[in-house]
Structure formats: structure tokens, C-alpha cells
Amino acid sequence: MGTAMAKNLAAAGHPVIACVRRPQQMGTLLALGLKPTTDLADVFGCEIVITMLPDDAAVRDVALGREEIKGLTAGLAPGAIHLSMSTISTAAASQLAAAHARYGQGYVAAPVFGNPDAAKARQLFVVAAGAPVDVERCRPLLDQLGQETFVVGTDPAHANLMKLMGNMLTATALEMLGETAALIRKRGLDPGRFVKLMTSTMFGGRVHRIYGNRIAAQDYAAGFALPLALKDVRLALGEAESAAVPMPSVSVVRDRMMTAIARGYAELDWTALGLVAAEEAAAPTSRHAAP
């Protein structure tokens, strides 16, 4: 995701310094017109720094620093903005916003809906929140990354909550797509025809159309790998527990994802919920996409 996004920014004429943790990535990034580095200090002179990282801990390390490594808060100039596009907890977002504020810096949360292919095609949907002046400063960049930006408030944590709940709608839909496809297949019918029927009538949205067809085709090649999906589910359940809101459907999805990973499917997409559903039903399965 991050590489595709950085490439699009560079193609739009923005000078991009790409900080990576793995030196072997530098050749690829250089070929894309980026200025790659493994030293976070090289971005300290930037007006806006974008982070696209896997989890709370990774974003905290970059923003707050660790051990002898200076983070963005200590390194960026007052007035600079940290544009955090990772899917993280609301607690982490609030902590980071407060830390940047102490240094006179802005913090905008802008997680995205969309897979790596959508990132390449600039078809992401961005969910942004932060101080209005900071969001507007970031908008020219966001416009090059996605097809639409939804501003959901001034508290960065609100963007992360919206993103997590959106992912839970997708995750529970994947579970039901997997279960219904397993039944259709076990009864000797074509799940693809079922998905076409449903998406042509009552369920015409992107999730049912795109992921439904992938589950029907038993296509589990990773776009959003199961461990990252499980991370988001756990974050969502943490938010639910904090608010005393039961989310039993999401709890089921968490357990199914854990089952998939325990069966050796950690490298597969979260569409592999369909594979687990088929196996649980003793329905015919194709393992061509499994390790």
C-alpha cells in the first residue's frame, strides 16, 4: 500500500522521501522516482510526513521514538504535520495527537478503505479527521491518493473508529459470504451464480461484489492478509469493550480468523474465511490458493 501511494504522489510532482525499514526495498523505490532512505531523520525537514504502518506499536515507534532513536515528535519542526494513514486504535490516535500538539505540530488521521490494487489506481476512500487547517493542508496529497476524502470531525480518533467499524462490516460480510457459498457448493450448485444473483438484486455493493466473487472462485491470494485483518478485529473488539457494546458477530469472526491462522493460512487473504467455512461444512474445496 505504502509503495503504491508514494509512487502516486511522486507521479503528481510531489518530492517524496520514502523511509523504509528494509534496505532491499531501496532499489525498487529509487526506480519509481522516489528518494529512499532507511534513516528516519531524513524526513525531519518535511512539512508533511505520511505514515502507513501495520499497527499501533509501529506507529508509536516512528512518532515517539524508541531507545536512542528520535521520533517524529522530537524531530519535526513546529507547524509540521504527521499524516497517519494506518489503521490503529483510537487510544493510539489520541496519544499521538496529544504528543504532536505538545511540540506545536499537527496530527491528522486518514486511514483508507481499499486494497493494494485500489491504491495503485488512486481509487482509495480516505477517512480523515483533525484540525480543519491541518486537514486542508493535507488535502492536495489525499486527492492524489484516493477518489474521495470523507472528513468526519476534528478529533483524529474518530477517523480511526470509523475505519475500524467499516472493516468489521466487511469482515462479518466475508464470514456470511463464506458460509452461504459453502452451503450452495455442498448442495451441488455454483456459488458464482449465487453471488451474481445477490449482487444483481439486494447486495450490489463493492464488498459483496468483489469479495463474493473471490470467495465463489476460491481465490484467497493475499491483498489483506489474515494477521492484519485479525489485528483490526481485535482493535474493534477492544473499542467495543471500552464502550460496553457487545459485538457477538465480530467475536465469531475473530475466532474464525484464529482458526484459519492455526490451520496454516496466515499468508492468505481474509477471504480465506470462506475456506474455513467450506472446510467446517465438509464442502468441496479448492486448495490452489493455499500454501
Question: What residues fall within each predicted segment?
Answer:
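NAD(P)+-binding Rossmann beta1-loop-alpha1 motif at the extreme N-terminus of oxidoreductases
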Residues: M1-M52, A80, P116
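Rossmann-fold dinucleotide-binding core
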Residues: A63, T87-M168
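Rossmann-fold NAD(P) dinucleotide-binding segment
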Residues: L40-G106
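Hydrophobic beta-strand scaffold residues
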Residues: V16, P36, G106-V108, T149, ...
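Helical "substrate-binding/catalytic lid" subdomain
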Residues: P156-E280
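Hydrophobic residues within alpha-helices
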Residues: M5-L9, L96, L141, L183
